């Protein structure tokens, strides 16, 4: 029997909360850059990438169809450095996310080495569930209305 870990895959799909029950498979985890995906409520999400050492000019965010892509290319250093220990990574990266229908980027800002990308779900009013009022006092379809006496 095979066990599938969907968590690495689901991190790449934003706004598909019921995706786990309909998908099988796995994907190699992405380890750079580290990121969080927050669900604030049913219509608001935030992706936060930890990008210490990057500048805002090193980053590019692009949306094409349902695909959100974040690219980073750090500027080359002018002098060679001999590291005794290198724990900080400065390497180019490309990170892509597939957005659910009606989900779009509302804001992006870079502050203190963190890139925040805010997402909002805007479902058109025609597609939103509508509440139907339940009336009373009407006869059923198969019954004749009572005659006034």
UniProtKB/Swiss-Prot annotation:
A single BP term in Gene Ontology: protein stabilization
Keyword Magnesium found: no
Subcellular location: Cytoplasm
Pfam family, one: HSP20
GO cellular component, one term: cytoplasm
Xref: InterPro entries: A-crystallin/Hsp20_dom (IPR002068), ACD_IbpA/B (IPR037913), HSP20-like_chaperone (IPR008978), HSP20_IbpB (IPR022848)
Superkingdom, taxonomy of origin: Bacteria
SUPFAM superfamilies: HSP20-like chaperones
UniProt keyword annotations, A-Z: Chaperone, Cytoplasm, Stress response
The record's note on its domains: The N- and C-terminal flexible termini are involved in oligomerization and in the binding of non-native substrate proteins, and are essential for chaperone activity.
HAMAP family linked: HSP20_IbpB (MF_02001)
Family as reported in the entry's similarity comment: Belongs to the small heat shock protein (HSP20) family.
The protein's assembly and partners: Homodimer. Forms homomultimers of about 100-150 subunits at optimal growth temperatures. Conformation changes to oligomers at high temperatures or high ionic concentrations. The decrease in size of the multimers is accompanied by an increase in chaperone activity.
UniProt protein name: Small heat shock protein IbpB
Name of the gene encoding the protein in the UniProt record: ibpB
């Amino acid at each position: 029997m095979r066990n599938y870990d969907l968590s690495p895959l689901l991190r790449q799909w934003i706004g598909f909360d019921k995706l786990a029950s309909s998908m099988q498979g796995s994907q190699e985890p992405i380890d750079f850059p580290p990121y969080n995906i927050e669900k604030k409520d049913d219509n608001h999400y935030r992706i936060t990438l930890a990008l210490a050492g990057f500048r805002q000019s090193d980053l590019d965010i692009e949306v094409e169809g349902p695909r959100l892509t974040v690219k980073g290319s750090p500027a080359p250093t002018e002098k060679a450095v001999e590291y005794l220990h290198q724990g900080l990574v400065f390497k180019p990266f490309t990170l892509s996310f597939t957005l659910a229908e009606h989900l779009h980027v509302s804001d992006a800002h870079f502050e203190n080495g963190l890139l925040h990308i805010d997402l909002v779900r805007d479902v058109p009013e025609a597609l939103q569930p509508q509440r139907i009022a339940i009336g009373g006092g009407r006869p059923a379809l198969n019954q004749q209305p009572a005659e006034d006496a």
